[in-house]
């Protein structure tokens, strides 16, 4: 599948998505979500969970780069957005530097093009002109966000910011030239609906893929 700038294997969902994995404890939802995230080829995962750091194997398999343990922190969603926005800023920085670098090299190899002295200083190091670098080689990073063990937390009971994130997840980290980085959200929950402290209707309505195991409900 191809969605925007992202490709996923034929048997995998398209990016970006909101995935709900629903099943009681020990049902296999963690294994299913881990396998799906690995299959889809994300560059790294942002984990939102008070228990994630205790599972090193999980952290290694999911290439977890950031962990938010305090699921009652009102600035949690803002922190996630900043990570993605910083990726957008860094990609724009790289693309701008690469454009200037190419112009500089053309000017150096030309007899008539003017040379920008600022760029001459910026790119010269170690007796050579160094090409700009970017962590993801000039492409948009593929980012997954995994929510686990958040039942009853302020993140779920005061969901205004989380609702907004689930609604515009594809548009987080907007780029000046158009498009955005975007993120895929994965929620691991024990019940699709619950009396209090679970995922609300707004997020459930944003669901694009559902992994459903046997639950306690008939």
Region locations from a protein language model:
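N-terminal pre-Walker A segment at the start of P-loop NTPase domains
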Residues: 1-8, 52, 62-63, 72-74
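An amphipathic, basic-hydrophobic helix/alpha-beta surface used to engage anionic
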Residues: 45
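Conserved NTP-binding/hydrolysis module of P-loop NTPases
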Residues: 58-99
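Conserved P-loop NTPase motor cores
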Residues: 4-7, 16-39, 50-54, 102-218
């Amino acid at each position: 599948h191809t969605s925007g700038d992202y490709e996923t294997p034929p048997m995998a969902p398209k990016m970006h998505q909101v995935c709900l994995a629903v099943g009681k404890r020990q049902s296999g939802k963690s294994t299913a979500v881990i396998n799906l995230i690995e299959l889809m080829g994300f560059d790294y995962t942002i984990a939102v969970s008070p228990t994630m750091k205790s599972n090193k194997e999980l952290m290694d398999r999911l290439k977890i780069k950031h962990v938010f343990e305090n699921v009652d922190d009102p600035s949690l969603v803002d922190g996630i957005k900043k990570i993605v926005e910083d990726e957008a800023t860094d990609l724009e920085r790289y693309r701008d530097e690469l454009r200037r670098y190419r112009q500089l090299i053309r000017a150096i190899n030309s007899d008539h093009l003017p040379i920008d002295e600022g760029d001459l200083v910026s790119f010269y190091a170690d007796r050579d002109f160094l090409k700009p670098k970017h962590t993801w080689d000039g492409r948009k990073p593929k980012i997954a966000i995994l929510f686990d063990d958040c039942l009853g937390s302020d993140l779920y009971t005061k969901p205004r910011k989380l609702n907004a994130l689930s609604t515009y997840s594809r548009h987080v980290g907007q780029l000046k030239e158009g498009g955005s980085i975007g993120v895929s959200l994965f929620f691991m929950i024990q019940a699709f609906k619950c009396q209090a402290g679970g995922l609300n209707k707004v997020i459930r309505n944003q669901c694009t893929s559902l992994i459903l195991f046997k639950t306690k409900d008939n």
